[in-house]
């Protein structure tokens, strides 16, 4: 039992002990935060040291591997890597300890708040006794003064009336003084009771606080001690390895690995030449240029070769099968006639046929002339069904360094299917060109309304009536899919719009052939499993899912096929790279808005965004080869403007205890990130970079002030005509920094049997869908009237009046964001090579 020091030492004349104890309790919370900061700083130092040791291990692995000293570098490398792992393990333990400290800080704050409410009565008692004490002193002083004055007047012989008045004053002062004495006694009793309880409570809080702090410090010291023990074990292992690495063992390893053989050259004795055998007309047998050494014909298995012949062959100083070797056993000795001329042997045609290419069953022999049968077939057209073709790269790999001239043949991917070969290849323009060419007209906006999937478009090349004929773009053949990550408006804010949650989930492994490499930071669908469903109940309201808008406006998830041999992503990373690893980040935001009339207060806005990181393919080798790659950590700046942040729980960790609301700290789960990138590389090994969805967020909107383009719609409907006016105004304050709105398109449905349309500026009317379309150039503060303008149209009707409908607007912007959110790397080991920001419309509608 601890002595109640607080109860005995915090009284005093001024009764200020309560304030000292209360502020001491608050200082405990400050101490907890400072301890957390200290441990975090120690973890940062250990992490930096671990990264330095890892670099040192890589340096040791890059040293010369030649000579007898080469195996020693392996010992250095293994020991250094283990030391780096020990320090990284300490970092992990310290990070867990920081979480425990932060949890205690939160609990401590709650307990302090509860204690403050409990000691409120003690604070009142302190105020009461302090005020009563001051009043008592004043009353006592007044009583003394009045009494002395009465006594002075009596001595001076004052009048009786004055003495009576002085007596009354003394009497009142006496009564007041006595009453304050009684009040002080009551206040003192209550104060002592309250203060006793409070002092004991404060001491209990401090005892618990110090015990918790001691537990944290004990865990901290235990983690450091365990690390030191591990470091000692690694050091002892290093010493043992060096002791075992003796001079003899190093020389033995070199002899085993680089030795050239144990057989010494044998003696050679002089042998006389056998002239009788050498002059019998034996013909030397020479090897053909491409003959295989040591290969002999075994035609007569029953016959045995003479050992004498072998001795003669050996006496020539050349092994069997060597160039210039004389085969006396199979020597061709010509027959001579009477005059000394050679007799030409008769050639049997049947024997020639039997030994021909088609009928010979004999084994191949280098001594016999070889016939080749060449059959030239006519060139066949490529029908796309041959699966045994190989690429130029495979030919180069199989025949070595033989140079091949370029060929116009079709290059085929290794795992390309027959269907893919049979289909005609559609040329894909670069990403920027696709963005610029993705307008409504080039993509057949006025085709029949699709009732099926939103990704289907009419394939007919016949243009519908009452519409200018425009050549179809390449992307109209295969329309791009609807972006999976496009945010929706919140449920309940817009009638008919529903939204399903889109949590992060592990990436799906595709069974099909890997897709072509995506452009940097392009949202590759094979790396995302996010899904969402959105519907709009109003049938006359144009939406993003209508056939007019599917694939017409640019999205940020389109693929871009990179030609072979080109690279448009981050630079490749090599294992010997000692510099910071390059990564890229993209912020993609979507603004959804609904304007109702000219009242700004009725505008409903929802802004959502995604953050994506892009990693070069070379970084995967570094992650997988390193036992503890550098932890990627970053700060999310201007986070106070975000209403909600949803990080990828599988890949990202965050510190929820941060006091700074404008900055959020995050760090990657490196094993999970390495596993994800490795799986992505297995799916698409040809890609030079891989995109990873990091987090999603929702921006705090400020009504119409958060919309980049303000809209007001006016309808004037009569039986014969309908007048329409759409006022728009560019709002640069909604963007950071202000950027032009590109590819602005306005779609308005008009019913009532439109016979004729007059518009300013010119619009396109689709009689089949009863919709008018305006296509505007870029809108910015440098445009005419600083980005403000009007769209006017007059429609002549046959079945009027028209019913005012909801219009839809779409646009996008590059190089700017609506939230102002930014990202900053923390720590070392990585560098930001690209920071891309962009936003586009989701459901951007206006009504009268």
UniProtKB/Swiss-Prot annotation:
UniProt keyword terms in alphabetical order: Coated pit, Coiled coil, Endocytosis, Membrane, Phosphoprotein
Coiled-coil region list: 87-114
Main location: membrane
InterPro entries: AH/BAR_dom_sf (IPR027267), AP2_Mu_C_sf (IPR036168), F_BAR (IPR031160), FCH_dom (IPR001060), FCHo2_F-BAR (IPR030122), GMIP/FCHO2-like_FCH (IPR054713), MHD (IPR028565), Muniscin_C (IPR018808)
GO CC annotations on file: clathrin-coated pit; clathrin-coated vesicle; cytoplasm; plasma membrane; presynapse
GO biological process: chordate embryonic development; clathrin coat assembly; clathrin-dependent endocytosis; convergent extension involved in axis elongation; membrane invagination; protein localization to plasma membrane; synaptic vesicle endocytosis
Annotated region (Disordered), positions in chain: 292-316, 404-526
GO molecular function, one term: phosphatidylinositol-4,5-bisphosphate binding
Domain F-BAR: 4-250
Record-listed Phosphoserine modification sites: 405, 417
Domain annotation MHD: ranges: 580-848
Signal sequence range: none
Family of this protein: Belongs to the FCHO family.
PANTHER family: F-BAR DOMAIN ONLY PROTEIN 2, PROLINE-SERINE-THREONINE PHOSPHATASE INTERACTING PROTEIN 1
Primary role: May function in an early step of clathrin-mediated endocytosis.
Assembly: Homodimer.
Identification of the protein by name: F-BAR domain only protein 2
Gene label: fcho2
